[in-house]
């Protein structure tokens, strides 16, 4: 079961985290001799030391400064998962709104992010999804083709194929995902050195998660039914396995709002919305 409060407090008292053994200059490549373990009085989440060797230091650092994810270079990607086999709204990724496929509108928004190094469209090997690959090529982004049912595996393989350390989990129906909140969440995610970061105070369909590669690997290795990982959020919220970080939008949205493309009436709603704001 979960650790009780006493055990958590006890572990925090004696927790050690990796730190820089001496002053280091920006762009220094870390070796094992650059790292020391010291007591973490901040009680923060330590970076896994196994992931530090060979990494470049982002900025000049001081002796015994604790190492956080934002202390070293990280490759951050946005992985958009989509396929054409939707049952509720068939081919919804290809349905057009104001002359653009809905999946292209998602790509447009992610391209506005400043903290993302790479955008990847992760789809399946099914012939029907050839059209999605064509759109990815047209829009100048990368693509990966993987498992149809095991969505967690598709994320993991896509991230690994492009050497990502962390990725933003994007679903193809998230037409109004917020690029400013994504950037804000990435900064918080790296600063906290956590496993997964959730956005809060956001309408349904606009909040996304930032996930480390090791986190998605753990889900693949422990999920009792790998083909039931489409709703990945339920696995990511397991605080028994993962250190979880939350980032609020700072706004008071109506939590009953649903901004996602699932049904025919959603398509009509977004068409009206885009027509209004594109006048």
Each language-model region and where it sits:
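Short, well-formed alpha-helical segments that are part of the catalytic scaffolds
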Residues: 89-112
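Short aromatic/hydrophobic "clamp" motif used to bind/position activated sugar donors
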Residues: 167-168
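Conserved N-terminal catalytic core of the sugar/cofactor nucleotidyltransferase
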Residues: 104-163
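Catalytic cores and adjacent flexible loops of soluble metabolic enzymes
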Residues: 1-73
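N-terminal nucleotide-binding beta1-loop-alpha1 segment
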Residues: 73-90
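Basic phosphate/pyrophosphate-binding loop/patch that engages nucleotide-derived ligands
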Residues: 161, 184-195, 212-228, 235-238
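Conserved alpha/beta core of the MobA/IspD/sugar-nucleotide pyrophosphorylase nucleotidyltransferase superfamily
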Residues: 73-74, 211, 232-279
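Conserved donor-nucleotide/metal-binding helix-loop-beta segment in metal-dependent transferases, i.e.
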Residues: 157, 162, 174, 178-203
């Amino acid at each position: 079961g979960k650790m009780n409060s006493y055990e958590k407090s006890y572990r925090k008292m004696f927790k050690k985290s990796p730190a820089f053994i001496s002053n280091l200059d920006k762009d220094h490549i870390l070796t094992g001799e650059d790292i020391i373990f010291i007591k973490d009085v901040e009680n923060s989440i330590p970076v896994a030391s196994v992931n530090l060797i060979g990494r470049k230091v982002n900025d000049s650092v001081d002796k015994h400064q604790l190492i956080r994810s934002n202390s070293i270079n990280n490759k951050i990607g946005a992985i958009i998962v989509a396929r054409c086999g939707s049952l509720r709204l068939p081919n919804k990724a290809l349905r057009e709104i104001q002359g653009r496929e809905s999946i292209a509108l998602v790509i447009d928004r992610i391209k506005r992010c400043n903290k993302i190094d790479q955008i990847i469209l992760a789809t399946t090997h099914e012939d029907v999804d050839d059209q999605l690959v064509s759109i990815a090529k047209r829009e100048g982004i990368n693509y990966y083709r993987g498992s149809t049912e095991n969505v967690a595996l598709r994320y993991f393989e896509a991230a690994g194929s492009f050497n990502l350390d962390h990725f933003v989990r994007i679903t193809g129906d998230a037409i109004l995902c917020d690029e400013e909140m994504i950037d804000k969440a990435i900064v918080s995610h790296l600063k906290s050195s956590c496993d997964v970061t959730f956005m809060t105070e956001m309408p349904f369909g606009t909040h996304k998660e930032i996930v480390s590669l090791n986190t998605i690997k753990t889900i693949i290795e422990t999920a009792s039914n790998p083909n039931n990982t489409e709703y990945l959020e339920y696995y990511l919220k397991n605080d028994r396995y993962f250190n979880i970080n939350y980032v609020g939008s700072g706004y008071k949205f109506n939590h009953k709002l649903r901004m996602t493309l699932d049904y025919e009436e959603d398509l009509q709603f977004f068409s009206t919305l885009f027509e209004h704001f594109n006048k």
